[in-house]
Amino acid sequence: MDFNISDSQIKWRSVAREFATKIITPEAIERDRIQLAEDRIPWDWIKLADEAGIRTLGVPKKFGGAEESILTMCIVGEELAAGDLGFAVIMDQCWKMAHLFKDAMTPDQQQKFIPPFVADNQATQLLALQSQKSALTIKDIMMALILE
């Protein structure tokens, strides 16, 4: 088994490291001290991450994404987290949901939901879970997708 990272992973690691060094790190402490959470959301970073291809790293190529592996996204996430963990989590949610959409949606559903996500350079995604039970198991999860 080869434990070396691929050329693509090296490329994306470099992109993420440069992004964290040049974009995130210079502003991270100041942004973290903003009192209101809604003012702290790094919309400018999200746009720049889109320009760099980071935001759509998990989106299938046929929809304009990089369609990278989970391991590649982990490598990129680690580099982003070195700059700001909160921002890395925002990107991670985008990647996680893109893989879920690819794997769990029908082609018609993919066509309805993935292109609008790719087209909006500030679009982010999240997964929220709620259970009526005190303990949540995977069989209890029911999902609905809402396009706003």
Outline where the language-model segments fall.
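Glycine-rich flavin
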Residues: 30-148
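Intrinsic disorder at enzyme termini
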Residues: 1-11
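A short, surface-exposed helix-loop junction/capping segment
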Residues: 26-28
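Short, cationic motifs built from Arg/Lys/His that form the positively charged side of catalytic pockets
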Residues: 13, 17, 109-110
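N-terminal glycine-rich anion-binding loops that anchor highly charged ligand groups
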Residues: 15-24, 47-52
